[in-house]
Amino acid sequence: MYVPLVSREAVNTAELDRRALLGICQAAGIDEIGVFVFTLQPGEEDDATVFSRMFAPGFGVPEDPATGAASGPLGAYLIEYGAVHPDAGRAHIVSRQGVKMGRPSEIHISIGMSGGQIPQIRVGGKAVLVGEGTVRPG
């Protein structure tokens, strides 16, 4: 669920009421979903298009510092509702996430447009490394 807010302060102070979320999901007949709060308010310390946070306790993630899977659809949402305007058939959006939890990330969302449709979305960026490992078969 995408929830636009008016300011970075509102994003930073947002708290998820999980009981209310579960009630909404139950009333809609769906499983628990994540909640992505964001603002388009510019920041003084960065040039991000979007400042955001993602809450997904139903997936075992109280807060995610870099949600690539939610960022692509966010880009489509921003274009659909006129918050971002493509230039020459492309839009580039930068989402700053994870700041509140001390793990700032910068997610780049590149959107290709053709005939008013979105045939291509690419997501990449930078995140804080908190661990790494190797998986060996067998």
Functional labels for PLM-detected ranges:
Residues 1-138:
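Active-site proximal loop and beta-alpha junction motif in alpha/beta enzyme cores
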